[in-house]
Amino acid sequence: MRHYEIVFIVHPDQSEQVPAMIERYKQLVTSQNGNVHRVEDWGRRQMAYMIQKLAKAHYVCLNIECGKETLAELEHAFKFNDAVLRHLIVQTKKAETAPSPMMKEVQREEARKAAQTTTEGQAA
């Protein structure tokens, strides 16, 4: 089995369905003797360029270990899901379990916002 990093972009109107989509894809991998090493929901972010007249979308990253048949089935699921705007599958040499640089940035932004609200609350 090989290791893969998958990033897919979901239509912003379908953001509330992202947890169910993640669960469905995780179940697909694990049901065929694969492993899910990391799941990161990066949230709604600004895209580099417009896709279908949309400037923002919901980003999700998965690090999995699976066979070629499972990967083909996942790719098929991405292609025929209208909510998935784009997907990228990259083969990696080993399982990545540490937070990605993107997730570290998201955590930094959340910490900064939390710090701002506490300082604003103290100032009032």
From Swiss-Prot:
**Record carries keyword Transferase:** no
CDD domains with a match to the protein in the record: bS6
* InterPro entries the UniProt entry points to: Ribosomal_bS6, Ribosomal_bS6_sf, Ribosomal_S6_plastid/chlpt, Transl_elong_EF1B/ribsomal_bS6
* Region of interest called Disordered, as start-end residue ranges on this chain: 96-124
Q: Which UniProt keywords apply?
A: Ribonucleoprotein, Ribosomal protein, RNA-binding, rRNA-binding
Query: Which stretch is the leader sequence?
Result: none
A single GO cellular-component term from the record reads: cytosolic small ribosomal subunit
Q: Which GO terms describe its biological process?
A: translation
Q: Which Pfam families match?
A: Ribosomal_S6
Q: Which SUPFAM superfamilies match?
A: Ribosomal protein S6
> What's this protein's family per the entry?
Belongs to the bacterial ribosomal protein bS6 family.
Q: Its biological function?
A: Binds together with bS18 to 16S ribosomal RNA.
Q: This protein is called what? A: Small ribosomal subunit protein bS6
What organism is recorded for this protein? Cupriavidus necator (strain ATCC 17699 / DSM 428 / KCTC 22496 / NCIMB 10442 / H16 / Stanier 337)
Q: What is the lineage of its organism?
A: Bacteria, Pseudomonadati, Pseudomonadota, Betaproteobacteria, Burkholderiales
Gene field = rpsF
